[in-house]
Structure formats: C-alpha cells, structure tokens
A protein has these predicted regions:
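Soluble or luminal CAZymes and related metallo-dependent hydrolases
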Residues: 37, 79-87, 134, 138, ...
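Short amphipathic alpha-helical segments
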Residues: 35, 39, 84-92, 198
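Juxtamembrane extracytoplasmic/periplasmic/luminal helical "stalk" adjacent to the first N-terminal
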Residues: 1-73
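Amphipathic heptad-repeat coiled-coil/leucine-zipper-like oligomerization helices
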Residues: 98, 104-105
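Extracellular/periplasmic ligand-binding regions of membrane signal-transduction receptors
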Residues: 35, 50-86, 107-112, 119-128
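Extracytoplasmic/periplasmic ligand-binding sensor regions of membrane-associated signaling proteins
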Residues: 96-97, 110-193, 197
Length: 199
C-alpha cells in the first residue's frame, strides 16, 4: 500500500515541479516583456517631451514673440490688431503640425494675451474662468503654477474644461523669460491628452 502511494506521489511531485518551473518562466518572461514595454513607452514619451522643449526654446527666442510681449491691449481698428492677427497666424504655421489632439497655448502675462490654434483671447482670468478651467485648482493657484516657474514643468493629469468640453490632460509648461530681472513673462503650453498617452 505504501509503495502504491509513493508511486502516486512521485509523478504528482514531478508534475508539480514542472508546472512550478513553467509558471516561473512564464512570469519572468511576462515581467521582462512588461519592463521592456514600459521602457520603450518612457523613452518615447521622453523623446516627445524633448521635441516640445526644442519647439518651445525656439519660440521663446522668437523676436516677433518678444515684440508681441510689449504690446498693450489695442482698441478696435488700431494697427496693432493687424500685428496681433499676423503673429497668431505665424504661430499657427509654426505649431500647426503638432497633433491636433494636443493643443498649443502661448500665454503672455504682462499684456494678458493668450494665443491658441483657434483664436486670440485677452484677459487671463476671463480665459481661465470661461475657456480653459482646471477643475481641481483656483485661478490664483493656476497663475502661480504657470508664471512662478523658472524651468519647464509638467503639471499632473487633471480634468480641464476647454470650451465646455471635459479633457483629461497633462499640461506642458515652458517659461518665456524677459524684462530686466529675467523673470517669466509668458509661457508656452501644450496639453498632452490622456488619449495620446494611452495610444
């Protein structure tokens, strides 16, 4: 009877050992594949951020942008209106090749102009309250995060209301320096939407 039980246990133990080894190999392969996938995704994201950095640096050094930062809010029919529209069109030509799901924004702090791919808006608070509202932060918090930075920063994924539509996005924020104290006078922003990250 004992030899019969041993005859049953030995093949069972052998099969269990094979199963355990196969399971461990499968898990190891799965973990390695996952690490490789995540490494490739991270490298791709880093490369994308580097391309945004390159575009932002070029734009921050643009002489037309520097001139635009000095313009005050124009009255209707002033010649300055033409300059603003022309600059908006130049921006569109420079940045229109960026994925349409991303969206670009050039936000000037002193004169409160906001250039987007669709329009030019005047008034930072108006823009925040009516056209691009971050649900989890106030206008003052947004202003501080946007303009009190010296380096490029990525704001965490947040729900943003853009023209009445909800979007989950990371905000890329690159400071435009100027003035005597070389402080942040404006920013270049891109919205990196959740859908882009999930693709």
């Amino acid at each position: 009877f004992v030899s019969y039980i041993i005859m049953l246990i030995l093949p069972g133990a052998f099969i269990w050992k094979l199963y355990d080894k196969a399971y461990n190999l499968t898990m190891e392969n799965y973990i390695n594949d996952s690490i490789n996938f995540l490494s490739q995704a991270a490298a791709g994201f880093d490369k994308y951020i580097e391309s945004l950095d390159e575009r932002s640096v070029r734009l921050a050094c643009d002489t037309n942008l520097k001139a635009m930062m000095k313009i005050r809010k124009p009255q209707p029919a002033e010649s300055t209106v033409y300059n603003i529209v022309r600059f908006s069109n130049e921006l569109y030509e420079k940045l229109s090749y960026i994925d349409k799901n991303m969206g670009y924004f050039v936000i000037l702090g002193d004169n409160e102009f906001i250039f987007t791919e669709n329009t030019v808006v005047y008034g930072l608070k108006y823009y925040f309250d009516n056209l691009r509202t971050y649900q989890s932060i106030t206008y003052d918090e947004w202003y501080e995060q946007v303009f009190y930075t010296n380096n490029r920063i990525l704001f965490p994924m947040r729900t943003i209301q853009i023209n009445g539509k909800s979007v989950d996005a990371i905000t890329y924020n690159y400071p435009i320096k100027g003035g005597n104290n070389w402080s942040t006078k404006g920013v270049v922003q891109f919205l990196i939407r959740r859908e882009y990250l999930e693709d």
